[in-house]
A protein has these predicted regions:
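Glycine-rich, proline-tolerant flexible connector loops at the mouths of alpha/beta enzymes
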Residues: 62-85, 101-102, 220-221, 359-371
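Conserved, mostly hydrophobic/aromatic
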Residues: 55, 67, 86, 118, ...
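An alpha-helical appendage that flanks or caps ligand/catalytic pockets
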Residues: 7-36, 149-184, 225-354, 387-403
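Active-site mouth loops of central-metabolism enzymes
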Residues: 31-46, 99-109, 191-200, 255-258, ...
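Short, well-ordered coil/turn segments that N-cap beta-strands
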Residues: 1-4, 60-62, 90-95, 121-127, ...
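N-terminal beta1-alpha1-beta2 module of alpha/beta enzyme domains
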Residues: 1-90, 193, 396-403
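Acidic (Asp/Glu)-rich catalytic clusters
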Residues: 56-57, 83-92, 115, 119-126, ...
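Alpha-helix-loop-beta-strand connector modules within alpha/beta enzyme cores
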Residues: 76-97, 378-387
């Protein structure tokens, strides 16, 4: 089992009242950047790099980054820059980017070059994930949401061809046209770095991933919904002649460890002011999913799954309707002493059977000191236990068995 560490890298130096007074009471897209203090931001970026360096020391297999725009809920607006820093200051763990929002790139060749440089600088440690991005990303970059999926798939095809086909060649697509494709920066890994796709349950993306044999990582999805989505992937995989295993699936869960359950529960409340934003104020629906962004498919499996996602009380409005105790009781977040965390994770791993576990260790108002203690306990007690559980349950990862 592949164990990687993640944090959203949220900025929380603002108030709920600030959000309510913003256009449409939104913490993303229209929340003014006048609330951002670059002095605080400078400290945060450097603290996050310190934590990622310590994560390597504690034995994580991978360091995961993500990207969002026009929001304080994630400071990763230029994730590839952060990845380049990690490529130089770390030596062993994979650098997992989940992921670059392909539809907003007008020049996918430039992206292919950036990622190739990161792969070379890290000496072949890049895992390149791609995403469609939220509606906010499309609106923030003036990208027509109607063509989001088309641009995602075409940009993906162009990046892969750029990595694998000697140039020069010409590209004449619907959304991208280049007379000469011939970058000298190509990845160290052959034929190209591994591609993983994260998401929260787009059925079309699940099918597309299975067609490409790409691992799909479920981002904090409910347990029943995750199993249903795995079945959509599995049905497609069988149609393409293979049976998916744990190496085709990953799962992201917030996991915070302290010396006692009481301490962990107290500290873990800091998550509530992380990627959901201070005040947990719901994002307007037309920001998250603008007209044209969603699918028009009438496949009954897809319709049923979409309804299940919409009715998930922990998803609607970004966890705004769920009390902290409810979240813990549902095991959507795993927070406690090492023994408590190991016990609960055994249950989750037995049920979900992912070959990749993304561990969201801290965010929001969780202090740097508490974050470092969490990572220390992870390295000393939790990660060794998880490796034993992974072997016992035969949770093969993509580096043990190619997807």
């Amino acid at each position: 089992m592949f164990l990687m560490r993640f944090t959203e890298r949220a900025y929380v130096n603002y108030t709920a009242d600030d959000v309510r007074k913003s256009p449409n009471s939104a913490v993303r897209l229209t929340f003014s950047n006048s609330h951002f203090d670059p002095e605080v931001g400078s400290d945060l970026y450097n603290l996050h790099f310190d934590e990622y360096e310590y994560s390597e020391e504690m034995g994580f297999d991978g360091l995961m980054l993500n990207e969002h725009h026009n929001t304080p809920t994630c400071l990763g607006a230029a994730m590839n820059l952060e990845a380049a820093v990690l490529a130089r200051i770390t030596k062993r763990p994979k650098i997992v980017l989940l992921g670059n929002p392909l539809p907003i790139f007008d020049n996918p060749i430039r992206l292919a070059e950036e990622l190739a440089e990161i792969d070379m600088m890290s000496r072949g440690r890049l895992v390149s994930g791609f995403v469609r991005g939220t509606g906010v990303e499309s609106l923030a970059t003036n990208t027509n949401p109607l063509y989001n999926r088309e641009r995602f798939e075409e940009a993906h095809d162009l990046v892969i061809k750029t990595w694998t086909t000697p140039g020069p060649f010409r590209w004449e697509g619907k959304h991208y046209q280049f007379r000469v494709v011939n970058p000298f920066q190509v990845p160290l890994q052959k034929p190209h770095p591994p591609v993983w796709i994260p998401g929260t349950g787009s059925p079309e993306t699940l099918v597309w991933c299975a067609e490409h044999h790409y691992p799909y990582l479920f981002l904090e999805t409910d347990h029943q919904g995750t199993r249903d989505m795995m079945e959509i992937y599995a049905e497609t995989a069988r149609n393409f002649g293979y049976e998916p295993g744990p190496e085709h699936f990953g799962y992201l869960v917030r996991i915070h460890v302290q010396d006692t359950d009481e301490k962990a529960r107290e500290v873990g409340r800091g998550y509530l002011e992380g990627n959901v934003g201070v005040g947990r104020i719901p994002l307007p629906r037309d920001y998250a999913s603008p007209v044209g962004y969603g699918s028009a498919s009438r496949d009954p499996r897809f319709l049923r799954l979409r309804e299940q996602i919409r009715s998930d009380p922990f998803r609607v409005g970004g966890l705004d309707g769920a009390a902290y105790d409810q979240i813990l009781e549902s095991k959507r977040w795993v927070i406690g002493s090492p023994d408590t965390v190991i016990r609960q994770l055994r249950e989750i791993l037995s049920e979900m059977r992912p070959g990749i576990l993304a561990i969201w260790t801290n965010d929001g108002t969780i202090s740097h000191e508490d974050s470092m203690r969490c990572l220390e306990l992870m390295g000393q007690e939790v990660l060794p236990a998880l490796r034993e559980i992974g072997e016992e349950l035969e949770l093969t990862d993509p580096f043990q068995k190619a997807p």
